[in-house]
């Protein structure tokens, strides 16, 4: 696509949403509680802030503000407000006066922000544990959230990933013609490295005329030792290994396809 000469600022909003899952098997209630505590500490608000700050660096965004919170009993959230251009400290108003209305803040966040929310959980009896991280990178202007794809998937040890990319709004060129997208894309997969694509089974559902792109990813290689918490495969019988493997694989298939699979 040839470069466009725009009339004013690029008003297109580009949003990339991730749903990333890490799956684990923890046999006892104590093990499940231990996994939840471990993953909650591993991906606390401070760690997530580091990941998102690096994401800002990768996509070329400037950080305006960071809000973070760890929750009880578990989970964390981080939201970073970003801009396309560097901010001059001399232009920042630090005087005492009422801030903007919440309506104004939300409108700004909807333009350029990066946020993450985490959701550790476990099955009450079956030994299955999942960690889900929801991430949204939403930018306006020439900044592209697609640059952060490989980094975010790698950082969050992803077994399963669902991604949505959409472009909204329009921008005008100097002749007044509206443009509803400013780059070529037919799949989110085109913005992934070959090494990353080799690791996953992938499936696309795209609505090209609406500038909506959806990709699902499921890790290809399954090694039981990577999915056990406080246990090793050698300590289990062959029957136990098969039972746990079947349980984990069924869980991963259900999450990947977004529907429950009946027991046969």
Curated annotation (Swiss-Prot):
The EC designation for this entry is: 4.1.1.50
Family to which this protein belongs: Belongs to the prokaryotic AdoMetDC family. Type 2 subfamily.
> GO MF annotations for this entry?
adenosylmethionine decarboxylase activity
List cofactor names only. pyruvate
- What happens to this protein after translation, modification-wise? Is synthesized initially as an inactive proenzyme. Formation of the active enzyme involves a self-maturation process in which the active site pyruvoyl group is generated from an internal serine residue via an autocatalytic post-translational modification. Two non-identical subunits are generated from the proenzyme in this reaction, and the pyruvate is formed at the N-terminus of the alpha chain, which is derived from the carboxyl end of the proenzyme.
One of the protein's GO biological processes? spermidine biosynthetic process
Q: Which residues does the Swiss-Prot or TrEMBL record annotate as the active site?
A: 112, 117, 140
Q: What is this protein called?
A: S-adenosylmethionine decarboxylase proenzyme
User: What is the gene name?
Assistant: speD
Q: Which reaction does it catalyse?
A: S-adenosyl-L-methionine + H(+) = S-adenosyl 3-(methylsulfanyl)propylamine + CO2
